[in-house]
């Protein structure tokens, strides 16, 4: 079982993936190959993410201990079976709720699929990125980490959609990732 910090250490390195996208509405399937390069980020980079993030009334207090908030830089290159290529790089920071104050106005309930059993050990917090996947600019989401399942789940509310991204480490060299993206419900505040 990996603790919160060890999970992120295990994520570092070069990952090659074969992805399959299922577009339910029109019944299409698309395949692609992606190489991810993941490296840990330094305290200065973590501070930079905090400074550009839209935190509203929330206050993050790491008390100079940036180790409690793991973060990494991700760069990837994807080539689809149609020959289309996409490259992107971003930095992400994971701040546990214990280090965030005045968060009631930013607490968005997770979608039903993302809800977890509260009786087990769970770390919840805010997921900050310097760049969104489907929308440009810094983005703020929520995460949960379940050590017993070695599973990180990130929920991001974009303007028009919601993405629920789940990453599970099965073994040191194998991870499973599922991303479900759907239209954002109109009753969720921005």
Specify the residue positions occupied by each region the protein language model found:
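Soluble ligand-binding/transfer domains with enclosed cavities or grooves
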Residues: 4-190
């Amino acid at each position: 079982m990996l603790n919160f910090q060890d999970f992120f250490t295990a994520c570092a390195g070069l990952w090659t993936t074969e992805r399959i996208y299922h577009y339910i509405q029109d019944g299409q399937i698309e395949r692609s190959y992606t190489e991810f390069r993941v490296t840990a980020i330094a305290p200065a980079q973590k501070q930079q993410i905090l400074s550009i993030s839209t935190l509203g009334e929330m206050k993050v207090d790491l008390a100079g201990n940036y180790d409690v908030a793991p973060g990494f830089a991700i760069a990837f290159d994807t080539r689809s079976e149609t020959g289309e290529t996409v490259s992107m790089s971003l930095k992400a920071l994971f701040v546990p709720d214990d280090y965030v104050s005045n968060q009631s106005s930013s607490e968005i309930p997770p979608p039903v699929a993302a809800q977890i059993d509260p009786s087990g050990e769970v770390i919840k917090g805010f997921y900050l990125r310097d760049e969104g996947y489907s929308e440009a600019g810094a983005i703020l989401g929520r995460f949960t980490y379940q050590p017993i399942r070695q599973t990180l789940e990130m929920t991001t509310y974009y303007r028009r959609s919601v993405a629920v991204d789940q990453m599970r480490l099965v073994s040191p060299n194998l991870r499973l990732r599922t991303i479900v993206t759907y239209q954002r419900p109109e009753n969720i505040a921005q």
